[in-house]
Structure formats: structure tokens, C-alpha cells
From Swiss-Prot:
Source domain of life: Eukaryota
Binding sites annotated in the UniProt record for Zn(2+) 2: C231, C234, H250, H254
Domain notes: The PB1 domain mediates interaction with SQSTM1.
Subunit structure: Homooligomer and heterooligomer. Interacts with SQSTM1, titin/TTN, TRIM55, RNF29, USP8, SQSTM1, MAP1LC3A, MAP1LC3B, MAP1LC3C, GABARAP, GABARAPL1 and GABARAPL2. Binds to ubiquitin and ubiquitinated proteins. Interacts with TAX1BP1.
Protein name: Next to BRCA1 gene 1 protein
InterPro entries per the UniProt record, alphabetical: Ig-like_fold, N_BRCA1_central, PB1-like, PB1_dom, PB1_NBR1, UBA, UBA-like_sf, UBA_NBR1_C
Organism: Pongo abelii (Sumatran orangutan)
Ranges of residues in domain UBA: 841-885
Role summary: Acts probably as a receptor for selective autophagosomal degradation of ubiquitinated targets.
Protein location: Cytoplasm; Cytoplasmic vesicle, Autophagosome; Lysosome; Cytoplasm, Myofibril, Sarcomere, M line
Amino acid sequence: MEPQVTLNVTFKNEIQSFLVSDPENTTWADIEAMVKVSFDLNTIQIKYLDEENEEVSINSQGEYEEALKMAVKQGNQLQMQVHEGHHVVDEAPPPVVGAKRLAARAGKKPLAHYSSLVRVLGSDMKTPEDSAVQSFPLATCDTDQPQDKPPDWFTSYLETFREQVVKETVEKLEQKLHEKLVLQNPSLGSCPSEVSMPTSEETLFLPENQFSWHIACNNCQRRIVGVRYQCSLCPSYNICEDCEAGPYGHDTNHVLLKLRRPVVGSSEPFCHSKYSTPRLPAALEQVRLPLQPCTPVMPTLSAAFVDENLPDGTHLQPGTKFIKHWRMKNTGNVKWSADTKLKFMWGNLTLASTEKKDVLVPCLKAGHVGVVSVEFIAPALEGTYTSHWRLSHKGQQFGPRVWCSIIVDPFPSEESPDNIEKGMISSSKTDDLTCQQEETFLLAKEERQLGEVTEQTEGTAACIPQKAKNVASERELYIPSVDLLTAQDLLSFELLDINIVQELERVPHNTPVDMTPCMSPLPHDSPLIEKPGLGQIQEENEGAGFKALPDSMVSVKRKAENIASVEEAEEDLSGTQFVCETVIRSLTLDAAPDHNPPCRQKSLQMKFALPEEGPLGNEREEIVHIAEEEAVMEEEEDEEEEDELKDEVQSQSSASSEDYIIILPECFDTSRPLGDSMYSSALSQPGLERGAEGEPGVEAGQEPAEAGERLPGGENQPQEHSISDIFTTSQTLETVPLIPEVVELPPPLPRSSPCVHHHGSPGVDLPVTIPEVSSVPDQIRGEPRGSSGLVNSRQKSYDHSRHHHGSSIAGGLVKGALSVAASAYKALFAGPPVTAQPIVSEDQTAALMAHLFEMGFCDRQLNLQLLKKHNYNILQVVTELLQLNNNDWYSQRY
């Protein structure tokens, strides 16, 4: 491989060096093109200096190779001279053609250049004889060439002429290009004289033929002569060639344009006013485009809550029609159209139009504020009602969730439920003094609508069907759209119990500007009030000594059906049931949910027939025993035999759980019909007895010292029990066993007297305090008695309940999870109960510890500590243990 050769090329006192790294593969055409580009020349003649310092022309590849050999001898360097124009061996061209050519090139090259070119051409020509100058004889100068080939001088002339025409054409194109590129500096006057081609001899013959721009360099502040560099993005920035080679104070990302000469032959004044907005050529515009940041605008849907007309907790009269207004702001960049609607999510507040679940919103532009309105009707029953909504555009939800929350006041007229209750109870005052106590309970705030249903069932059978129908229609539930429910909504505590707004005194105001929390914050100094259930009211009635007598068999059946519809509407408000059905519907796709689940009345009766044991020591729950006329005397020694049965089954969820798996005790004989297996329990806890009302005319046998019940007529009932006597809600007190006892059915009782005086044994302390959280609603009071068809109906309800329980594995799992969450929620926010410290023996403590071990809580010390902390309430202990384990799992995972 040949060594590298350095070519030192000189053109009119301008020297440039070229390094030929691979001379063997570098051709003469490459060198010639490189020199033309470097010096901005079109036609050149290159000569090099040999050893004798004589100029030798290079016109071919062979001559170039000889020059490379000479460079090796001179230390791998070669001195080269560049001359404009080619060596032409012809005479002077005809005068006419020459005149035209000079006229065409006026202002391009000085006249001395062409005169010198003529002298060079004339000196190299071989002049013929006298006559040859005029006649151009071909044979004289080309004796050795064929006749059809033109003479050399003619060929050379045509070649020179062609090159000159091409050069002129290129220069004209450059002129048009520079008219767009050359932008004037505003500080140098309105009409830039430096752009026009000067015609003075001084300008034409500047050193190295460089043009003076009459522009000061922005870096060195000297006049720019020769090559000028102009910023393509900043037209007012110009620097000279020397400053461009070194550091200069400008953005290095801006492209600099190299300009050798200005616009040529500009006839019109080139003023700033004419070219106020100069544009760069398309090629440079393409270079500038990537430098501009691209900020695409993405369509976004967003909204913000601004204001409302009815704040949360507004008191309204029943049946009042009102319109809720929300002021919403379109904070996105998409205009709201007819496809933008306010969709109903969930709630129990009655709509003015039950079919209008989607409300049109105003067509708001981005940044505008409008009013969204929904018309509601206040329900007939007093309480707190809410309705939740959210904006949606073509099925895509956006913006904060808004809601309407009102409090319906009691009836102000004489026909209010409380006044009706007053009338019914006052009519029975003459029968017994205890009816006055019952009136006090019925007028309490917690009894509200269910107290009305209870009294109507006991008092008048004619008005019950219509009233129950009204109650069921007023408590109509709306099933939300599954598409609009988000994970945030499903996990919200507001969906765990859709009546959560009825447990709080008020609901916080809507949170504005798109900040909807996962759960509405609890108001300060607001106690948690649970909506009383039917079982609670029965407990209150029983605690006051009130006992209602049964109706006739046909009337009781009809009332039971009506009460079932009322209770069905009440149970439909369970948030657990609602969320479970929503999730199951989303899992089963097209399967429609059963929004009217089987009446809990029957399913609970099935459960009452089985001795399902609840959590021990729960001060919020009471054993409800149904008896008819007198208490059954039980021995104290039987308690120890049944104590083991108390610990067999424990429910880990709250009293609001839907279904249970019951482990039957050994004493329950499944081979006999249900009517033959009858149980009765006695409460012999010293100093404390609790009773609750069951079916109409059924009284709990709880007082050991009592011999019988005294009816208004003074007659005593025989010691017999109906089949409904065996149904007990095993919400436990302190270690009270179930003692089986077989009894017979009693004769039907007259319904003439609504009250029966209830004698309690001496020392019996009847509780009158309403617990914060009610027990499971006792819904068996509407069942008929004394028929074999009752047994079949209860067995059918048992089968139906088991089928409903096992209908969906996924639904069961979801129910269980949400029940536990609801239990934790209620356990968190329910205040500590005010009860006496229970007396728990060592055996009972050991049984509780064994239950906790079976559940998987094996920390004996922690279990004992929590049992003492919660007064041996195993439900609260399990709830706290679950929370501790859940917190530990979360901390280990994250």
C-alpha cells in the first residue's frame, strides 16, 4: 500500500491542503472535483512543480500517477497550482461570436481575463501560412487526421463556449436563490447597497476577488470581506470566515449559511418593506422543521364540580318534588354534545321519572360552566336518602361523582304513622298498664317505619295490605349500570351498605374540583345510628312487657304475605346483596340479577329451627325465644350438658350476613320430621333476662318463677307450645344452652285484646336500652300456626335457601368478602357498647380460646388479651384479629 500524500494546492494566494490517504485507489477525477468544490471553480487547469521547480500540467490519470511518483520523491508532498480555464489549441474565435459572448458576460469577469486568455491561446497555436488565416484549410493543420473530424481549434472553442454557457446558467440560478437567501441587516439602512453587484473597478479587483459585504461581523465587529456566514434561523446574525473557524457566541444548533457573493444584477432596489417576511427555500425549511417542538393536542374529557343548590342533609317533607342542580365546569378540551349524559349509578332516592336514568347535560365548550339538573321525589317514609350520579360520554365515564342527599321529615298531619300508632295503642290502654310503656317505645325515633308495620300487623288487618304495598313502592331500588361502576366505587364503604347514609346524621357535601374520595368522610361528633330492624322493635316490645295476641289463621297468613313484601323491600337495601348481584351479573355476562331475593322471613325461620350458635358474649345481641303462655322450668345442671354445643358453630361475619352453614347438634334428630323436633330454651342467667316478641301471640318462656300468663279475660293458657316455639335467633348471651323439649300445638287464641300483661319474676332486670347495632330482623311473626302445611312450607323455604346459597360459587365468595368488610366497617365506627362486665368462667374462656384456635388464631396470649379487652365478645375479637393480620400482610407485601 502506497503511503499517504499531502497535496498543497494554491489558487491566487489561497492555499489549501488535501490529504490523499489511499493514492492507489484515488483517481484524477476525484482530485479534480475536490479542487473545484474547494475553490468554487468550474473550469480549472492544475499544474504541479517537479524536481526542477517547473510547472507540469495534469490532465489525465497517467499524468496524475506520474505526479504521485514525484510526490514520493519530495517527501510525500506535492505543490500544485490551480489556474482557471483549460489549455485550448485554437485561434481566436470569430469576432461576432466573441462580441456576443463578451456582451453576455458583462459584469461577470474583467476584460483583462479574456485578453490574457486570447494571448495564451494564440501563443500555443501553430499559425499556418498567409492564406491559411482566412480560409481555415483543413489539410494544413490536420494532415494526420481523417477529413470528417473537425479541427482541434474548433473543438476547443465549442468546449469552451459550452462551459461558459453552463456557468452563466448556473450563475443565474444562484442569483434567484440568493434573492431569497440574502437578508439585510436592519441597522444598515432601508435599501441595502451591499446586496447589489458593484461595478466599480475597486470592488472588482479586491484581493482574491473577494466581495465586500458592508456588514459588520457580529463576533469581531469588523467588516466582512469575502465569505460570509449567515444564521439560517437568525437573519440578523452574520460572522466572517475567521470567526466561524473559531469560537463564537451563538447557538451551535443553528445552521450557518456560507455565502460567497450577493445577488447579481439586481435591477430593483431590495428594500425591507418589500420583503418584510422573508422565507427560506424548501430545503432549509425541511431542516428547520425537526427543530420545532411538536405538541399534539389529545382530546381529554374532564369535569369539575363547582356548586349545588341543595346541600347534603336538606330536610324535606314526604312526597315533595324537587330539582337538584349541580354546577359543573368542562375542564377538558372536548365539547360536551348530545352523547354526554349524567348517568345514574346507585341510590335509594326516588326519581320523578323512574325510567329516566340518563339525564342530558348542556353542550358546554371547554372551560365553560353549566347546570346539570335531576328531578326527584321525596319518599313517603322518613329517613335519609341519597342518589349518586356521574358524567359519561359515549359510555366513557369522567369527572367527579356527584350525589343528592336529603332527610325526609316525619308526617306533619294527623295521618302520620306515629299518630296512627298513638291511636292504636291508646285504644288498648284500658286493658293493661304496660301498653303505655309500649307507646313510649313506639314513639321513639329508632322505630320509624318498621314500628308502623309491626303495630298495623297486630292491630288492624284490613289496612295492612294497602300500607305494605305503599311501603314497598316507596322503597323501590335502582340497580346501577355495571359499566359505570369503577373499582373505586366497588371498594367504597358506601356500597358495602347502601343505607350507610341512613346510619349517619348527615352526608358530607360534594367534594368539588374532581376530588371524590373513596369513602365519604364521617362528620365530626356524629354518632353512628343503625336503622332499627323488626327484631329490635320486638325486643323493645318484650322488654316493656308488651305482648300482642294473634289474629285468626287466615288473617295471619294474609298479613304474613304483606309483611314479607315490606321486609323484602327493606332487605333489598342491603349493600352486600346489591354489590354481590352486580358483581355476579358482570361475571355471568348476560345473566340478569335477581333484585328481589327470596324473602328472608322464611330463610331465617329455617335458621331459627336449627340451633345455629352466634358469637358468645355479644352484648349487642339477645336470644329471642318464642313461647306462647308460660316459661318452662329448666334445671341448672342441664346447662353443663349443652355447654359444648354452644361452641360448635361460630359466625365470623356480622349480624347482617346472608347465609350460614349450620352444624347440627347431636340432640337434633334429622330422621324425624321438623314438627317432631321441637326445642325450647330457658334463660337462667341471674340478674339478667331478655326476651323478644316472636309470632303474634307467642311469648318467650323465660321467667322460671312464673306459672302462667294472664289474659285480659283472666283465663290461663295450658302449658303448650306451637311449632314456632322452637325457632330462636341464637344471637347469644353469656353461655345459655339450648334445652330440647317436645311440646304440642296450642289452640288458636282470640285476637280481641292487643295487649297482655307480662309478669316477670322477682329480681328480673328487663333491659330497655336500645343497642346501637340491631340484631338480625326477626321476621317470623307473620307465619301461621298449628297446621301441618307449616312444616312443609318451612322445609321448602329451607330447600330454597340452600339452593340460593349454592347458586354461584363466585357469588358466595364475593358475599363473604364484602360481609367481612361490612363487619369491619361497622365494628370500626360503632361506638363501644355500654354493658356490664360479663362473668366468664375458666371453662367458657377455654372454649372461646379453642374456637379462636380452630379459626387459625394461635397466639394464646394475644387472644386472651383481646378477649379481656372486648369483654369476651368473640365477634369483636375476631374482627380485630383479622384487621391485625390484614395490616401485617399489607406491610410485608409493600
